[in-house]
A protein has these predicted regions:
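Nucleotide/phosphate-binding sheet-loop regions of phosphoryl- and nucleotidyl-transfer enzymes
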Residues: 1-390, 417, 423-426, 433-438, ...
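Short beta->alpha connector loops at strand-helix junctions that form conserved
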Residues: 41, 449-451, 470-473, 561, ...
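Conserved alpha/beta-domain cores
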Residues: 93-94, 518, 528-876
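Flexible inter-domain linker/hinge segments
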Residues: 209, 378-410, 524-539, 546-549
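Structural motif
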Residues: 239, 409, 426-428, 447, ...
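Extended, non-globular alpha-helical segments
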Residues: 395-435, 486-524
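A short, small-residue-rich loop immediately preceding and capping a beta-strand
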Residues: 444-450, 468, 830
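Residues forming the flavin
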Residues: 464-466
Length: 876
């Protein structure tokens, strides 16, 4: 029996998502529920994988199954594909397993040609509608399938409207549209080396299926997948569906609706529609639509039926639904439903409401929230004082919440470049398209002239947590000249504007923003998450302010305090430079004694902010050359302070130069060559702990972490210095406290010898930033130059510095954990690289059995939620 590559909607269900894609599985499920669905069939994701494996060809077997399904659809609809009197027309849409809005391309009205369009005009008795459908098909097919730029066609439409003296597409007559079709076909031919527009509907269909498969690998899809951790080998399914028409006159229309508000989560239908339009007009945001409540006046029966079925869908899926619908001459059809994309704020509101309504459990609520999206909750709002003097120059649709201020840029590329220069960017576009994804990602905010709350800009911005205001029709924009005018002002590239994505207001100038405060739903979801998770979550912090912030966000301690960051203060850096450039141990010790009070006060402030929570203190790690002066004035000041000549200081600085400093004289190697550094740091740690215990009665157990260890003897050497100094301090103070000495596992050799190192270390913390660098053999600072080529060539799927490489680096982590605990059963294990705040890496840490993850303060909620999700998935 040959493999089944094609499924009718009547043959699938919601559980077949991996095979049929999200859209195909939902269309099958809606068919099973008895909803009014235009019938059709799905070409599976496996067929997409086969297409790539077969050298980008569709095999005869798959093509045969597509044509068999087409025969069934013809019988079902009572129409023939390519018929000259009453042709069957279909839409061809992509549908991957994971929702990827605007990443894949849609083709409508497929099956029309020069002859069948006349039969279609006769059958419908509506020539204008028939020719409008044909011109749309030529335009979409040329753009999506043959890559003839859409702008070529838009330009011709504008020229024709000018010639005919009309403003809107809808004012063009059937004769005008015939003329337009002729011009469109000419453009097609000119761009396709003289080839004519294909007239055989079967050729059209197979080309369209191939185009959807190809679009799985277009640059914007690759970028979206990398940003959202979607594997490249999943492939996309293709849905072929009988057409229904929303552009057959005033009793037809098309719309997009959500069963709850996707920005706030408020209960109640939220959406919009256009009378006499096709679906892509709403989604692409080409015309600005009406709110869904108006449908009750325009078509009350359709509205009542729609409301009933929308609630049926939400109750069935037990989640907020995003639905596309078309009304053809008074009859309602659903074209798709899916769990709606939503802001983080809305996700929390909806999850809590669904628990209160008894539709889902707290466990399900926790699993439903995308951990990464919590980032959005910590988004800025405008400073209330600054806002008082803000001048509103316009307002439009509040498409994605948050406040943003920045310089205006008019293209995605310019936005990206400006962002790389360090500018805050507001991307201003007539409308955004999927090609703009990287520019949108680089922007603080997005402002569009066209498009509604469900346009491409709105959906993508909400998904990324970027502030967006859409559909500001008052703007007069010239993207070529890089200028727009609004509210009586003219803005050029580089001028400042501010946007409020929660109200839709647009302000002149650069208004100060402030960090967000989180709401009650956040606390509720976090309370559930904390109940379910096993992993502890700590933070990486070097200042009391960072520490307080992280504790507010739920951090249970500090997993990495980088002591060197405390030395970069302008008051302190001369003292560390003096220590570095001193020739004798005595001079070094004298300089270190000047630093001791600063370091001790810092630790005291951190301990107080932590109120007894644990803190892991990493001893001095960076290469010494990072501290030496480079500015002329600093060199002179240091020379004067040390009683040396400028030339002597310069020479000493030059001697510290290393060819490969990241693998040079740093980490524990500093403590081996200059034990006095470790002595000073130990004295500061222990004295601070004793004094805070006396002042605040906190029971502090310092965790002292020695970095860059590659050998047990290395650790033993530094640990002896620490133990001797700690004993000396405690003897002086006559107060004795517990402390632990551990190490960072960041050199592959340390992972290989973890069983030996655990004889000395009381805890391991995986420094996955350096462990990744040393395992891959490339530097974090330089890898960006070539990694993009690796993504394009599908060598790597994601940035190994952002998402832990479980195949390589992960194996070292797992091995070190197992070997370490074989030696010391109670060995505490944590991770303190940037990976500590990445959800998939947190899940890995849970599986390997680490005790905690540590991440930057604002990622603490993400890690808490990801840890709970990992525990719940394991139970399931």
């Amino acid at each position: 029996m040959s493999q089944k590559w094609v499924y009718k909607f009547t043959e699938g269900n919601a559980n077949m998502r991996n095979l049929l894609g999200g859209k195909g599985a939902n269309l099958a499920e809606m068919t099973n529920l008895g909803l009014p669905i235009p019938q059709g069939f799905t070409v599976t994701t496996e067929a997409c994988t086969d297409y790539y494996n077969s050298g980008k060809k569709i095999t005869e077997e798959i093509q045969g199954q597509i044509f068999d399904a087409l025969k069934w659809l013809e019988a079902e609809q009572g129409k023939q594909f390519g018929d000259v009197n009453d042709p069957l027309l279909v839409s061809v849409r992509s549908g991957a397993r994971a929702s990827m809005p605007g990443m894949m391309d849609t083709i409508l009205n497929l099956g029309l040609n020069d002859i069948s369009v006349e039969g279609f005009a006769k059958k419908t008795g509506n020539p204008r509608f028939a020719y409008d459908s044909y011109r749309r098909f030529i335009q979409m097919f040329s753009d999506v399938v043959m890559e003839v730029p859409k702008s070529f066609f838009e330009k011709i439409i504008d020229e024709l409207k000018e010639e005919k003296g009309v403003h809107f597409d809808t004012e063009l007559t059937a004769e005008d549209l015939k003329e337009l079709i002729g011009r469109f076909k000419k453009i097609y031919s000119e761009n396709m080396d003289g080839a004519e527009f294909p007239q055989d509907p079967r050729v059209q269909l197979m080309e369209a299926v191939k185009a959807v498969f190809r679009s799985w690998d277009n640059p914007r899809a690759i970028v979206y997948r990398r940003m959202n951790d979607i594997p490249g080998d999943w492939g996309t399914a293709v849905n072929v569906q009988a057409m229904v028409f929303g552009n057959m006159g005033d009793t037809s229309g098309t719309g997009v609706a959500f069963t709850r508000n996707p920005s706030t989560g408020a209960k109640g239908i939220f959406g919009e529609y256009l009378i006499n339009a096709q679906g892509e007009d709403v989604v692409a945001g080409v015309r600005t639509p009406q709110p869904i409540s108006r449908l009750a006046e325009d078509m009350p029966e359709c509205y009542a039926q729609f409301m009933e079925l929308a609630m049926k869908l939400e109750n069935h899926y037990r989640d907020m639904q995003d639905m596309e619908f078309t009304i053809q001459e008074g009859k309602l059809y659903f074209l798709q439903t899916r769990n709606g994309k939503r802001t983080a704020q809305a996700a929390l509101q909806i999850a809590c409401d669904l628990v209160d309504e008894g539709k889902i459990t707290p466990q399900e609520a926790v699993l439903r929230i995308e951990a990464k999206s919590l980032d959005q909750l910590l988004h800025p709002t405008f400073d209330p004082e600054a806002l008082k003097s803000g001048e509103v120059i316009g307002s439009a649709l509040p498409a994605s919440p948050g406040a943003a201020a920045g310089r205006v840029y008019f293209s995605a590329d310019e936005a990206k470049m400006a962002h790389m220069r360090g500018d805050r960017v507001i991307l201003v576009r007539l409308e955004t398209s999927p090609e703009d994804i990287e520019g949108m990602h680089a922007s603080e905010g997005i402002l569009t002239v066209r498009g509604g709350m469900t346009s491409h800009a709105a959906v993508v911005a909400r998904g990324m947590g970027t502030c967006c205001v859409s559909g500001c029709g008052e703007i007069k924009i010239d993207e070529e000249a890089k200028v727009f005018s609004l509210g009586g002002y003219t803005f050029h590239e580089g001028d400042y504007i501010s946007l409020d994505g929660s109200t839709g207001k647009i302000y002149k100038g650069d208004i100060k923003t402030v960090e967000a405060s989180v709401s009650g739903n956040f606390g509720r979801i976090m309370m559930w998450a904390d109940k379910f998770r096993k992993l502890q979550v700590r933070t990486n912090a070097d200042t009391p302010a960072d520490t307080e912030n992280a504790v507010k966000l739920g951090a249970e301690g500090i997993g990495l305090c980088r002591t060197e960051h405390m030395f970069f203060d302008p008051e302190r850096i001369p003292k560390i430079r003096k220590m570095i450039l001193s020739d004798t141990q005595e001079a070094r010790e004298a300089a270190l004694m000047e630093l001791l009070p600063y370091q001790k006060e810092d630790f005291k402030a951190m301990y107080k902010a932590l109120k007894g929570r644990p803190m892991t203190i990493r001893y001095l790690d960076p290469p010494l050359h990072e501290f030496v002066p480079t500015e002329e004035a600093d060199i002179e000041a240091l020379a004067k302070d040390m009683g040396l000549t400028k030339e002597q200081v310069q020479q000493k600085c030059n001697e510290l130069h290393e060819f490969n400093p990241m693998m040079g004289h740093r980490g524990c190697r500093l403590a081996v060559t200059f034990p006095e550094i470790a002595k000073m740091q130990t004295r500061a740690v222990i004295e601070a702990a004793i004094e805070v215990k006396e002042e605040c009665d906190y029971d502090i157990v310092p965790e002292i972490m020695i970095p860059l260890v590659g050998d047990k003897k290395e650790l033993k050497f530094v640990k002896t210095v620490v133990d001797d100094t700690a004993k000396q301090v405690m003897d002086e103070k006559k107060i004795y406290i517990n402390y632990h000495v551990g190490t960072m596992i960041e050199i592959p050799r340390a992972a290989l010898l973890a069983d030996e190192i655990a004889e000395e270390a009381e805890f391991f913390s995986f420094g996955t930033n350096d462990l990744t660098q040393m395992t891959f053999g490339f530097s974090r600072d330089d890898a960006g130059k070539f990694l993009s080529s690796y993504y394009e060539s599908k060598i790597y799927e994601s940035d190994p510095f952002a998402k832990l490489d479980q195949n390589g680096v992960g194996k070292l982590v797992k091995m070190a954990a197992e070997k370490g605990r074989a030696t010391r059963k109670d060995l505490k294990l944590g991770i303190c690289g940037e990976h500590g705040g990445d959800p998939s890496s947190v899940e890995f840490c849970h599986q390997v059995g680490l005790n905690y993850v540590s991440c930057s303060p604002f990622r603490v909620p993400i890690a808490r939620l990801a840890a709970a999700q990992a525990a719940l998935k394991e139970q399931a």
